[in-house]
């Protein structure tokens, strides 16, 4: 057929990759919510959800049915348009962040030359969603949680970006595939250990996960900026949080742990195993650490993480210049 051109085939393949990645990431985020509850039950010496299906295997289906039939309520004095847009922006920005992650040598939705910058841009866009949610709800707790979240996210995104500059300098590229190929013989976690530590801490903070979940602290703010949300709007925030965890875990693997590289097993399997390990670490951190005060979180970022990233960047630059001579 004359209308089937190589460009059309490439477009169709790109759409297919995007749809597959969308389904896989959303499914992983949904299953992680169930897995987290089961593992937290194990860590805390209790049962966890085990009533629906064999061993709780159908709990996720029950949660989805319940969420679909929840009343989609909008507060009377809220800004209805912005209130509705906020969860959509949050979910979309977190999902788009995964588009730049190379799952295997030939499987990446968007192989951008500005891949890391695109991720930082999407992470910044999520701040607007949180601010929209807090302001449009017309609720003091919601607004206070949104202000906490925006201040925390903007602060830790500085450390998040600086922690990646050493990796970019070593690879000589912002392209994620180039960064993975540069780790064929030595993972970046060895020369960039302090960069990895800072990225891991900042990644947890940007995802608003325990112990950096002050924006939605139940004891203080009654669930923070999404206190007024219900039904599918709340579901978008809820699943979006777990998609953020999947994305940050995948980025840790891609940037510091060799991506798909590994012996014997296929590339995709190695990538999936490494990503699952870091997703487990998110759950273990939640089960293990207490929640600090909000001022302690901000102080830790500016007084510990920022100097650590700057020292790591200066040492990396000095080593690269020394090797070039």
From Swiss-Prot:
Query: What is an annotated GO biological process for this record, any one?
Result: aerobic respiration
Q: Which UniProt keywords apply?
A: Cell inner membrane, Cell membrane, Membrane, NAD, Quinone, Translocase, Transmembrane, Transmembrane helix, Ubiquinone
Under PROSITE patterns, the record lists: COMPLEX1_ND1_1, COMPLEX1_ND1_2
Q: Which Pfam families does the entry mention? A: NADHdh (PF00146)
Indicate how the chain sits in the lipid bilayer. Answer: Multi-pass membrane protein
Query: Which GO MF terms does the UniProt record name?
Result: NADH dehydrogenase activity; oxidoreductase activity, acting on NAD(P)H, quinone or similar compound as acceptor; quinone binding
- Descriptive protein name: NADH-quinone oxidoreductase subunit H
GO CC annotation terms, alphabetical: plasma membrane
Q: Mind telling me which residue stretches traverse the membrane in this protein?
A: 11-31, 50-69, 81-101, 114-134, 154-174, 186-206, 237-257, 265-285, 304-324
Q: What is its main location?
A: membrane
**Function summary:** NDH-1 shuttles electrons from NADH, via FMN and iron-sulfur (Fe-S) centers, to quinones in the respiratory chain. The immediate electron acceptor for the enzyme in this species is believed to be ubiquinone. Couples the redox reaction to proton translocation (for every two electrons transferred, four hydrogen ions are translocated across the cytoplasmic membrane), and thus conserves the redox energy in a proton gradient. This subunit may bind ubiquinone.
**What is known about its subunit structure?**
NDH-1 is composed of 13 different subunits. Subunits NuoA, H, J, K, L, M, N constitute the membrane sector of the complex.
